[in-house]
Amino acid sequence: KGLYSSFNSMNMFEINHSLLRQFGPENWTLYKGKHLLCFVDNHDVTRVASILTNENHLPLIYALLFGMPGIPCVYYGSEWGAKADKSQGDPALRPSFKEPEFNELSEFISKLADIKKNSKALNYGDFTSTVLTNKQCVFRRSTGDETVYVAINADDQEYTAYFGAEKNQVTDLLSGAIINLDGGLKMAPYSAYFLA
């Protein structure tokens, strides 16, 4: 619930609080070092494409899912934005699809999965929040030899994030773009970045 609720209420503090409580840098956190299954929807709840109030947030919620600690799970059909409400009953939530519908969302999730699969930091790294506003969050996932910053802008306006990265020039793993951080990270409206 914290994932979609943070986007619907434009309150990134909600999901950040949960992630810090579960995986933060303190020794008392609940699941530090654990690899929990994480999802935005499943066979028993309203599909995330139906529950988000702004469709521009759909790719962003998956970016957050694949960037945060845990093992991301994508419920079949949700990778292309299938919709269904829990009030419609189980058959609506668990349909038989004739064939997959490849689209921008499924391509984006495929990129996220590839990035996650190939990143030690995203699979085993610690979690540190570096920038947090109601509509933006940047967090660091880091192991001894790799660091990835995950940056989300859920707003319809550009935002510049300053977060003290270890190096001034980074690569966005999603786009392949080389980004100079001297003036901060200029985040486009409704955007996500995985910076290494």
Where are these regions (language model features)?
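Active-site beta-strand termini and strand-to-loop segments that position acidic
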Residues: F139-G144, L195-A196
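Conserved alpha/beta catalytic core and glycan-binding cleft of carbohydrate-active enzymes
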Residues: K1-Q88, F127, N134, R141-T143, ...
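C-terminal beta-strand-rich structural cap/linker in extracellular carbohydrate-active enzymes
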Residues: L181-A196
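Aromatic- and carboxylate-lined catalytic core of secreted/periplasmic carbohydrate-active enzymes
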Residues: G24, L93-T130
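Beta-strand-rich binding/interaction modules
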Residues: Q157-S175
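Short glycine/proline- and charge-enriched loop/turn segments
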Residues: K1-G2, S87-K98, S175-G176
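Solvent-exposed beta-strand/loop surfaces of large extracellular or lumenal domains
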Residues: T171-L185
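Ser/Thr- and Asn-enriched, surface-exposed coil loops between beta-strands
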Residues: V131-K135, L181-G183
